[in-house]
Amino acid sequence: MEEYQVYLKLHRSRHQDLLYPLFFRESIYRLAYGHGSFFVENVGYNKKWSLLIVKRLITRMYQQIDLIIFANDSNKNPFGDSNKNFYSLIILEGFVVVVEIRFSLQFWISSLKELEIVKSYNTLRSISSIFPFFEDKLIYLNHESDIRIPYPIHLEILVQILRYWIKDVFFFHFLRLFFYYYFNSTSVFTPKKDISISFSKSNPRFFLFLYNLYVWEYESIFLFLRNKSSQLRFKYFRVFFERIFFYEKIEHLLEISAKDCLYTLSFFKDPFIHYVRYQGKSIFVSKNTPLLIKKWKYYFIYLWQCHFDIWSRSETIYLNQLSQHSFNFLGYFLSIRLNVSVVRSQMLQNSFLIQIFIKKLDTIVRILPLIRLLAKEKFCNILGHPISKPVWVNLSDFDIIDRFLQICRNFSHYYNGSEKKKSLYQIKYILRLSCIKTLARKHKSTVRTFLKRLGSEKLLEEFFTEEDIFSLIFPRTSFTLQRLYRDRIWYLDILFRNDLVNHS
């Protein structure tokens, strides 16, 4: 029993009065700067929000007494007019900024480093670290499931999830009040089914925080079931979904199992299940039989329906055999291929041939999604023909070339794990010619004239390495050279996907 408590026990040091001490005192600054200068900016979000701005916003919140005292005019919507709606957004942004500090990845890692738990963290957190794991494990597994995580869920469920982390009762009352007024004012103009979509667009930071919180709760329950898979009957499976009084329920179930049930409640660890999530999808691979895989499928559906009140159909989870199925993952097209090797064996005067089948993971980069991405960013048209980038014409020649080279390096860095580099070479060619056309347009010259003046080999060396040029000129070389130039290299310093490779 103690082993289960270690896994799902809430960190009491984290479960504390969080928001009110931070909002109504200035301990937010001590908390933020006490764990290093990680709170600088959020990549991919509006960078105008900083700690200093939040301090000013909280100061302005103190001055808005009519936002805090709702009892004076209970019939009036405090978030109704535009001015008060602006201050409600201030409160919402301040809330998210404060909570992000507490839930920040660097905040947790700083605590782990003090305990010397994480030593090679920067390598493990790389999104490319999953591919070497796939190369080692995927070839021994049989089944793969594509899971589409259902969303959105009812906001009251998200408030209940926050109860596991925050003890501020007044904050939950305020959060429910905010949701009530926001959705009532929005539903007048927006259909019910589109309210969550409009909410995600108007408050992307808060929406992303709630989504990550929901996924974290769903995965924490699933990982417990994965590590300690239960042999309970289906009707008893539901009791594990509610985290409150979790351990008392386990003890109660053990008593029931020993006295009234014909079977015993036991837990076993299944080492052949692997789970990976990316964006709004997840991959579930296993070596189990099809019957056990279907059992896990309905466990997922039951979890979403009973714990999160989300109606999910069985079609949201697809079951496939790895030997007959290929799937997309983080920009790569993955499949299991059988390599046949013929070995001649001789015993005394008899010789015979032996065929050896070896499974291998294929990692292929498809060219069409990359061309669509470059076309969207105005580097080429939809057919892949390079065009100039007119918005960069006002930059200096050095800045134009540097920007194109940086994009090219990003592609090479990210997709260097591909076994076949032809798609990557085509992308480099498009970027190189787009760079030349942009420079020619800036100097009001033709491409041919500009290349004569610059030198045709000048930009070729910048965009293509020596082995790239060699493989393009001599596509059919010896097996040793092909293996040298086509080996997969996974860079373990990629912490997030660049916009120009985020095409899935």
Curated annotation (Swiss-Prot):
<comment type="similarity">
    <text>Belongs to the intron maturase 2 family. MatK subfamily.</text>
</comment>
<keyword id="KW-0150">Chloroplast</keyword>
<comment type="function">
    <text>Usually encoded in the trnK tRNA gene intron. Probably assists in splicing its own and other chloroplast group II introns.</text>
</comment>
<dbReference type="GO" id="GO:0008380">
    <property type="term" value="P:RNA splicing"/>
</dbReference>
<dbReference type="Pfam" id="PF01348">
    <property type="entry name" value="Intron_maturas2"/>
</dbReference>
<keyword id="KW-0694">RNA-binding</keyword>
<dbReference type="InterPro" id="IPR024942">
    <property type="entry name" value="Maturase_MatK_N"/>
</dbReference>
<dbReference type="GO" id="GO:0009507">
    <property type="term" value="C:chloroplast"/>
</dbReference>
<keyword id="KW-0934">Plastid</keyword>
<dbReference type="Pfam" id="PF01824">
    <property type="entry name" value="MatK_N"/>
</dbReference>
<keyword id="KW-0819">tRNA processing</keyword>
<dbReference type="InterPro" id="IPR024937">
    <property type="entry name" value="Domain_X"/>
</dbReference>
<dbReference type="InterPro" id="IPR002866">
    <property type="entry name" value="Maturase_MatK"/>
</dbReference>
<keyword id="KW-0507">mRNA processing</keyword>
<dbReference type="GO" id="GO:0008033">
    <property type="term" value="P:tRNA processing"/>
</dbReference>
<dbReference type="GO" id="GO:0003723">
    <property type="term" value="F:RNA binding"/>
</dbReference>
<dbReference type="GO" id="GO:0006397">
    <property type="term" value="P:mRNA processing"/>
</dbReference>
<protein>
    <recommendedName>
        <fullName>Maturase K</fullName>
    </recommendedName>
</protein>
